[in-house]
């Protein structure tokens, strides 16, 4: 019987020198102490303790794959972006789907999922950094507080008290809370969930006309979700359930696909609609701004190296291309800086030179040097203006002017539009009886051992949304329906600026 042999790969140090012995450390005699001149041992240990890079503050654990984006409908009347220049056009992309608050724990544990896409367009990388929910919170000033509330406390364990204390003090969170506590709260896999850009972005066309836009990505596999009990069983057996499902589906040739839709609002409509169109706690009614199918994408190639491509992938809403822009959405405005800056901390200032993040088009930035620099600047002049015609700006790609007004101040966004209950009420009333009961039961399970005054505070928000929401939640939590208003007298939050 003959045995096929793989080609021998000789072990070397990082400088290319051969490793003579990878079994025994260099010592003074058989039983003597180690010698500091054991170069391979020194290098091996030094590299080992630096293998782990800083964890993402959110979306720490995820899966990723490369894929193909294909345009299915002409939207050039809305945008000049070349990725949408013609029907049938294909663009290479990378997607990372992730848990949000669960650190690097089990995939089936936390509820919200991250949905980040990177498109390698001929005009630069375009990133859509969203979630599997269409809404979030209105101001990034509270994002660090959210992070601390939903993750480990100072005592090193997650706390239902911290989580729900924070949520219940922010009535604007009820829309998101209603979604994540619903029967769609825990996706069965990354393949079986929708994705949303969530924010309001802008498009502009060759004529300089601006439109406001929301991006939607609907799973062609359909929606599948887990109950709390089903998720608990999966967690006990397989902490990588979502990662395994996505990877193995692609390996089998069952490429997951999503259809991309947009909602388009003419620029002037933003001042006319009866809600704040840039408020991330709100959705746009589809009867007013229907979904328009634009494209589809599939994830069809697994990374060869998980760390190189998935862990080092870096997404930022500031990665925009001509024809696609931002909006006055406060959360988006702050993320334009914060996300890229988080990648500089996590991966270094030259994170865009890592292959998975590198644009496929030529890059002619005169930013130079810094830790991890891997490309050369061959031009003699690294400054602008200069006498050699280098680094010339491109005014033809300027975004149309945006009219703004108002005095600079710490404006209370609640004074602009404090209706945080109409939309969760509409969502609640779309649910059938079984879905409403799942919402009540999931909320009760998630609130756990949180103090009663926090539970009552949340129930008051539910009552303000819909009496049936409050009554069902009260019953699931074992609270007396008549008590929520009376409990205000013992709620310590009443002294915190009238938040309730």
Swiss-Prot record:
The protein's job, in short, is: Decomposes hydrogen peroxide into water and oxygen; serves to protect cells from the toxic effects of hydrogen peroxide.
Family, similarity comment: Belongs to the catalase family.
Q: Name one Pfam family in it.
A: Catalase
Its organism's taxonomic lineage begins at: Bacteria, Pseudomonadati, Pseudomonadota, Betaproteobacteria, Neisseriales
- Alphabetically list the UniProt keywords: Heme, Hydrogen peroxide, Iron, Metal-binding, Oxidoreductase, Peroxidase
* EC numbers, comma separated: 1.11.1.6
Q: Which organism is it from?
A: Neisseria gonorrhoeae
What catalytic reaction does the record list?
A: 2 H2O2 = O2 + 2 H2O
Task: Locate the active site.
Answer: 59, 131
Protein name according to UniProt: Catalase
